[in-house]
Amino acid sequence: MNLKKKMLSLAIGLGLGASIGFAGTASAEEVFVPLISKGFQHQFWQAVKSGADQAGKDLNVKVTFEGPESEAMVDKQIDMLSAALAKKPNAIGFAALDSKAAIPLLKKAQASKIPVIAFDSGVDSDIPLTTTTTDNLAAAGLAADKMAELIGGSGDVAVLVHDQTSRTGIDRRDGFLNQIKAKYPNIKVVSVQYGAGDHLKSTEIAKAVLQANPNLKGYFGANEGSAIGVLNAAKEMKRKVVIIGYDSGKQQKAAVASGEMAGAITQNPVGMGYKTVEAAVKALKGETLPKIIDTGFYYWDKNNMNDPKISAVLYD
């Protein structure tokens, strides 16, 4: 099933539709909602964009979607946010690379009565009316449980995270580490490193960790780029380790199907994009939003990746 069909079926399954849109209202003025993402290079963000674009069509809203070339480019993202706000949008969606850096600009949005909807990564502020996101603490905790099961409850493991500034980076790291500490005293985390979500940089980091830890039994990659880096490093060094990733994408799907990766946590990126735009429309209509819109997660592996509820949220 292609991404568009997956997204449409998911939207139907969630009960989403055009009923809350602006079509047929008295105002002819176009509603404009830009989304500023954490990146554009991973298939995850392309899937989020697909959901947002579909919501724009369904709800009669002009949606734009952009993000920096690298998830290390906090300053570039702030510039994009500033430029988007200068266009005086009706509302704005924002996935923060740094949970604090954008707050001054978000205060300006609030002062201008521009509703802010956070997605994927929230900010350390109550300015966003809601955050559409995965419960990353719980999701990474599930990854820790699966890792423990697969390595037999003992041994050395490592963690490779995309950053230590975004809410997702912090929560996925802490969710995994806290679960290991709380439940698995015989598992030792020997390395926690950060690769900026870049698969090339992550590969080099993972190779160094594998070289320094010949007895490593497991490796958790906390986003798509991190997981691909771990996978590439293990293949280059011909090391057999249990690899658990995050998200999906063509390379991770192939690796899980072949057994090179044990499995991964999948989010619902299409639903995340859709619900971000939907929340913006609701905010503009004066509706009260929950502080968190949980878009859900699953653990997937070669045994369940073709189940309809799993395959619907996996992307290429």
Each language-model region and where it sits:
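Bacterial N-terminal signal peptides
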Residues: A11-G21
